[in-house]
């Protein structure tokens, strides 16, 4: 009779341990579930992103500390109120000057040669009609002097990404997560161009990696916007309209196979004989651009492993077998969500 209380105590202890174990298991499952739900919300595709809510009506702009939308600056205003500071860039079509307007830094682009005015004005029309979260903000323009004023981005283009991340101020941002998000935004822009208000547009100013990267600016809050819209020809497959990026021979490993002269070195290049192509040239270039954007930070190799299959699809020799930009974008988003979930679960287990 004296042993019964000890048996009861033993039984009670086991019951307590079982209850504690079940509570712990329930906590782990609940935390994981909440993390999954949170990450799904954070990384699910959204119609509106970083600056979409700040877009102004057509013909207006808002930059930096300006709270309200203002009309695009006119020739008179640009002449009176915009002050050039220094030359910061120069391409085939225009020179770009860091300038100042009412204490704000802006980029002033000026035509280099009147022979290229058609390209310049085409770029202006594109900027006017395609203002969105994917495109640099148009501040003003003057057709009389062939001048375009846009928002200035001090971090430069995607070509300067590694240099930007090397500064102590930004080293904390140099993670595979942030680099993959930049990759997603780059592909989002390609997808926007392929489904633009003007139809299917091809980014022709991209015959080598540096040239392709220089078309996209890195904003101060680490987003990507298209900056140069001078060379965006339209493809319309239903009407049989394909394009050629310029009238000169294109060479190199960066461009798609269909952009190369197909008749060998023994036949002199002729634009009349060169076949046209479609937007799948942009898809071919995605893996090389993304490889640069991912860099060599810790975790980037895991990201590359998860992107291997979709990048293999992008590299198909037959353009029709390559995925659309939307398919690439969907895959990138899924990979980011998956890796973020895996990381969150691993961190939760470590805490427990």
UniProtKB/Swiss-Prot annotation:
Protein O-mannose kinase that specifically mediates phosphorylation at the 6-position of an O-mannose of the trisaccharide (N-acetylgalactosamine (GalNAc)-beta-1,3-N-acetylglucosamine (GlcNAc)-beta-1,4-mannose) to generate phosphorylated O-mannosyl trisaccharide (N-acetylgalactosamine-beta-1,3-N-acetylglucosamine-beta-1,4-(phosphate-6-)mannose). Phosphorylated O-mannosyl trisaccharide is a carbohydrate structure present in alpha-dystroglycan (dag1), which is required for binding laminin G-like domain-containing extracellular proteins with high affinity. Residues 38-352 are lumenal. GO terms for cellular component: endoplasmic reticulum membrane. It is an enzyme of class 2 (transferase). It catalyses: 3-O-[beta-D-GalNAc-(1->3)-beta-D-GlcNAc-(1->4)-alpha-D-Man]-L-Thr-[protein] + ATP = 3-O-[beta-D-GalNAc-(1->3)-beta-D-GlcNAc-(1->4)-(O-6-P-alpha-D-Man)]-Thr-[protein] + ADP + H(+). InterPro entries: Kinase-like_dom_sf, POMK, Prot_kinase_dom, Ser-Thr/Tyr_kinase_cat_dom. GO terms for biological process: carbohydrate phosphorylation; protein O-linked glycosylation. It comes from Xenopus laevis. One of its GO terms (molecular function) is protein kinase activity. Its EC number is 2.7.1.183. The chain crosses the membrane at residues 17-37. Residues 82-352 form the Protein kinase domain. It is found in: Endoplasmic reticulum membrane. Residues 1-16 are cytoplasmic. This is Protein O-mannose kinase. It is a single-pass type II membrane protein. Belongs to the protein kinase superfamily. Ser/Thr protein kinase family. STKL subfamily. Keywords: ATP-binding, Endoplasmic reticulum, Kinase, Membrane, Nucleotide-binding, Signal-anchor, Transferase, Transmembrane, Transmembrane helix. PROSITE patterns: PROTEIN_KINASE_DOM (PS50011).
């Amino acid at each position: 009779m004296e042993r019964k209380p000890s048996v009861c105590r033993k039984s009670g202890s086991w019951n307590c341990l079982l209850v504690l174990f079940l509570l712990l298991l329930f906590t782990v499952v609940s935390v994981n579930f909440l993390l999954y739900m949170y990450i799904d919300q954070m990384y699910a595709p959204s119609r509106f992103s970083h600056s979409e809510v700040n877009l102004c009506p057509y013909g207006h702009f808002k930059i930096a500390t300006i709270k309200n939308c203002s009309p695009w600056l006119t020739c008179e205003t640009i002449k009176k109120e915009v002050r050039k500071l220094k030359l910061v860039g120069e391409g085939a079509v225009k020179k770009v000057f860091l300038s100042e307007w009412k204490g704000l830094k802006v980029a002033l682009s000026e035509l280099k040669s009147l022979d290229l005015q058609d390209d310049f004005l085409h770029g202006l029309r594109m900027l006017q009609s395609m203002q969105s979260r994917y495109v640099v903000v148009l501040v003003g323009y003057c057709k009389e002097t062939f001048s375009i004023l846009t928002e200035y981005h001090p971090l430069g283009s995607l070509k300067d990404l590694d240099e930007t991340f090397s500064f102590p101020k930004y080293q904390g941002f140099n993670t595979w997560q942030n680099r993959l998000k930049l990759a997603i935004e780059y592909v989002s822009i390609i997808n926007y161009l392929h489904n633009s208000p003007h139809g299917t547009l091809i980014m022709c100013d991209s015959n080598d990696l540096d040239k392709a990267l220089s078309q996209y600016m890195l904003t101060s809050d680490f987003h990507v916007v298209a900056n140069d819209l001078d060379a965006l020809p339209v493809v319309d497959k239903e009407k049989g309209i394909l394009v050629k990026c310029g009238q000169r021979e294109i060479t190199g490993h960066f461009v798609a196979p269909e952009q190369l002269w197909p008749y060998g070195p023994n036949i002199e290049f002729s634009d009349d004989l060169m076949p046209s192509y479609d937007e799948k040239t942009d898809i071919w270039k995605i893996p090389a651009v993304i490889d640069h954007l991912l860099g060599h930070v810790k975790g980037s190799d895991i990201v590359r492993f998860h992107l291997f299959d979709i990048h293999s699809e992008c590299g198909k020799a037959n353009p029709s077998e390559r995925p659309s930009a939307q398919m690439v974008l969907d895959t990138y988003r899924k990979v980011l969500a998956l890796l973020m979930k895996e990381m969150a679960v691993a961190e939760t287990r470590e805490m427990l």
